[in-house]
Amino acid sequence: MIQFPNAKINIGLNIVDRREDNYHNLETVMYPVSLRDALELVEAKDLKFTSSGISIPGNSNDNLCLKAYHLMASDHKLPPVHIHLHKHIPIGAGLGGGSSDASFLIKLINKKFGLNLSDSVMESYASEIGSDCAFFIKNKPVFAYGKGNQFRDIELDLSKYFLVLVMPPLHVSTAEAYRGISIRPVSRHLTELMNLAPEEWKHQVKNDFEDSVFPKFPQIAGIKSTLYNAGAVYASMSGSGASVYGIFDKETTLPDLERENQVFYGV
């Protein structure tokens, strides 16, 4: 059985305050996009995880897909399986690829083995793996708050726009991005701003991580500027980077950006 875990982008990201547990409270809109991995699950003699495509750093035994399997196996009698992940979503990009893979595995296990778990139960499993994992269970636009693990549905449809995603050959440390953050009050609530057309977002919908990341990585700032110069109605870094997306009102190509970056069109 195979499924295709998709990426997400963050539209606006406000760091609200620092919590007593040293995490931060934030507000952001998460929006699913069509850039996808491929995830296959088959029964096997022994539990096994393999991958292809983009090389996944670290020990494969620490992969979030295996973590999801073990989490569900602790509550349900599951047979050994072979999990194969073909990685296409860039890693360390602020696109939630690893979280999506783990959440889609939860959905795969639920379907393949007839567990008949509700979305809320699967969200509970996913939230134990990572703060944004539960988003990918329902996989529709939400306003996320708290640590980024509490969600409220919103109406947002960008299907009439052309989205371009740019991934530079850079890695941004999320911890380092947080260290450079200056917490500032917001003048208008993000859910209110989502009632505006994307053409009105440029000077109002901000990603707070850009203030700490752009000075250290001017190449990422340059990508955002290039997207606007090419006609994007809105452009932003996703999450803590390093990817940047542009929302265009018509199909476009960006050969200048293709020379040094991965560029994904029509996501």
Annotate each PLM feature.
Residues 49, 138, 143-234, 249-259, ...:
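Conserved, helical-rich catalytic subdomain that frames metal- and/or nucleotide-binding sites
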Residues 31-32, 127-128, 134-137, 155-159, ...:
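Solvent-exposed alpha-helices and their adjacent loops that cap or buttress functional pockets
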Residues 102, 106-143:
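Contiguous, small/hydrophobic- and glycine-enriched helical/loop subdomains that border
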Residues 1-93, 111-120, 155-157, 167:
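ATP-binding N-lobe of GHMP and related small-molecule kinases
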Residues 84-113, 131, 233-245:
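Glycine/serine-rich anion-binding loops at beta->alpha junctions
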Residues 11, 39-41, 65, 98, ...:
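Residue-level signal for inorganic ion chemistry
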